[in-house]
């Protein structure tokens, strides 16, 4: 797997995207600093997901940004995405790794050190750790706080991105005190002014990285 810049990892949710299609929203986010894109669209048909993924892949290829597909290994293979991200209710990381082979990116969600270590052992390339804070997108998600994310980061030897309720107002504190490699955001990027959200969050992330000496 090539080295990935996880600084600002955008996850799509069409419920936040108004007046444009997902590919257009993704392009705005990338132009303003997003370094990884995860296509995460629930409650749509496989055909619709595939067609959206094709359009988004055109955009990510244009800017040489990795495209990760949430859960759907078949869609990832169909559009030649760079990888797949799986959560606790999806296929196990080890199974996804076996299907995709050694060259694709496989990410796993973790709410605890034990889950993170298991994902790493099964072949995950990175961990999505959280939920850092309560979040509107997944209100049922377990909140582990900045300290919980820090423990996960310290336990594994692969990159960790913090996810869950992180936005431009708290990204600085999350990066500074958890030691993670980047921030993953849904509403923090796509809810409202995508350009401003992305620029503001990237500025806060870089400010924290600078203070950390990264």
Curated annotation (Swiss-Prot):
It holds the Pfam family TMP-TENI. GO terms for biological process: thiamine biosynthetic process; thiamine diphosphate biosynthetic process. Its cofactor is Mg(2+). It comes from the Bacteria. Its EC number is 2.5.1.3. Mg(2+) binds at residues 71, 90. Pathway: Cofactor biosynthesis; thiamine diphosphate biosynthesis; thiamine phosphate from 4-amino-2-methyl-5-diphosphomethylpyrimidine and 4-methyl-5-(2-phosphoethyl)-thiazole: step 1/1. It is an enzyme of class 2 (transferase). Keywords: Magnesium, Metal-binding, Thiamine biosynthesis, Transferase. 2-[(2R,5Z)-2-carboxy-4-methylthiazol-5(2H)-ylidene]ethyl phosphate binds at residue 165. It catalyses: 2-[(2R,5Z)-2-carboxy-4-methylthiazol-5(2H)-ylidene]ethyl phosphate + 4-amino-2-methyl-5-(diphosphooxymethyl)pyrimidine + 2 H(+) = thiamine phosphate + CO2 + diphosphate; 2-(2-carboxy-4-methylthiazol-5-yl)ethyl phosphate + 4-amino-2-methyl-5-(diphosphooxymethyl)pyrimidine + 2 H(+) = thiamine phosphate + CO2 + diphosphate; 4-methyl-5-(2-phosphooxyethyl)-thiazole + 4-amino-2-methyl-5-(diphosphooxymethyl)pyrimidine + H(+) = thiamine phosphate + diphosphate. Binds 1 Mg(2+) ion per subunit. GO terms for cellular component: cytoplasm. Gene3D superfamilies: Aldolase class I. Condenses 4-methyl-5-(beta-hydroxyethyl)thiazole monophosphate (THZ-P) and 2-methyl-4-amino-5-hydroxymethyl pyrimidine pyrophosphate (HMP-PP) to form thiamine monophosphate (TMP). NCBIfam families: thiE. This is Thiamine-phosphate synthase. The gene is thiE.
């Amino acid at each position: 797997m090539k080295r990935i810049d996880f600084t600002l990892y955008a996850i799509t949710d069409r419920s936040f995207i108004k007046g444009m299609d997902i590919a257009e929203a993704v392009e705005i986010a990338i132009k303003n600093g997003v370094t990884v894109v995860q296509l995460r669209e629930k409650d749509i048909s496989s055909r619709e997901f595939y067609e959206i993924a094709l359009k988004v892949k055109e955009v990510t290829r244009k800017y040489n940004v990795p495209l990760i597909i949430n859960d759907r290994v078949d869609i990832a293979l169909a559009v030649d995405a760079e990888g797949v991200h799986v959560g606790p209710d999806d296929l196990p990381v080890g199974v996804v790794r076996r299907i995709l082979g050694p060259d694709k990116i496989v990410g796993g969600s973790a709410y605890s050190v034990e889950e993170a270590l298991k994902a790493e052992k099964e072949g995950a390339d990175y961990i999505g750790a959280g939920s850092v804070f309560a979040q509107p997108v997944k209100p049922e998600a377990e909140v582990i706080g900045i300290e919980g994310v820090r423990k996960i980061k310290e336990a594994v030897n692969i990159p960790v991105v913090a996810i869950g309720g992180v936005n431009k107002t708290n990204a600085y504190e999350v990066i500074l005190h958890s030691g993670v490699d980047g921030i993953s955001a849904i509403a923090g990027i796509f809810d409202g002014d995508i350009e401003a959200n992305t620029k503001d969050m990237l500025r806060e992330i870089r400010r924290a990285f600078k203070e950390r000496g990264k």
